[in-house]
Amino acid sequence: MSEGTTTGTQEFWEGFYQDRDQIWTGKPNPLLVREAASLDPGTALDLGCGEGADAVWLAGLGWRVTAVDVSSTALRRAAVHAEQAGVGERIVFAEHDLAQSFPDGEFDLVSAQFFHSPVAQDDERTKVLRRAAEAVGIGGVLLIAGHAGWPSFIEDRHDVHFPTMDEVLDGLALGADWSVETKDAVEREITGPEGQVGLRTDTVLRLRRVR
C-alpha cells in the first residue's frame, strides 16, 4: 500500500536500499530489546521498519505489528523476513512517507528506532514523533531511540544535528498525561562498513501514556 509519498524522500530511501542486497544485520535493535522485552504483547507500530528485524522480533513475542516504511524495496525484504521467521500473519506492512500520511488506529507500543533522515528537517521529525505519541493508547508506550552523535571513527563529520533527549521531550510537549520511564544514554562499540571499530553513543526514551 502506498499513501502520500514525497518523491525526494522515496527516491533517497529506494536508492539506499537498492544499493545492496541487504543493508542491516537482520537482528532487532538492542535498545528495543532492552526496553520492550518486559512489556505485555499487544498491538505495535514500527516506524521506519526497514528490512523488518524489529517487527519480526516483536511478532515473535506475540505482538501484532503494523510496520511502515517509505521504501517499497525495504518492505518487500521485510515481508520475506517475516515469512521465513514464521510470523508473517502477525505483521501488516504498509508504505508511508510519515511526513505525508500516518497509519490509522491506536497502539500499545509505538517504536521509532533511530528515526533520522538526511532528507528531512528537524521540524518534520518532531511532527512525526508528535503524531506517533497521538497513536499511543492509554497505558501504552512510545519508545524513541536515536544517535547522540557520530561514530568515533568518522573524521569527515557533516553538519548534522542529533537531537538531545531534552530536545525530543520539549518537541513532544506531552504534559501530565505521560510519564518518563527511561531516559538514558548508552555508549556501544560498533564496526563500520569498512571494518572500522569505534564507539557511538545512543539515546533512548521510554514514555508511557498514563491517561
Residue ranges and their predicted role:
Residues 1-39, 42-50:
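Conserved class I S-adenosyl-L-methionine
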Residues 55-98:
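Class I SAM-dependent methyltransferase SAM/SAH-binding core
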Residues 102-109:
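A short acidic, Gly/Pro-enriched loop at the edge of an enzyme's catalytic core
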Residues 111-113:
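A conserved beta-strand element that flanks and buttresses the S-adenosyl-L-methionine
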Residues 118-131:
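A short, conserved alpha-helix within the catalytic core of class I
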Residues 139-147:
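Conserved beta-strand signature within the Rossmann-like core of class I S-adenosyl-L-methionine
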Residues 155-177:
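Conserved Class I S-adenosyl-L-methionine
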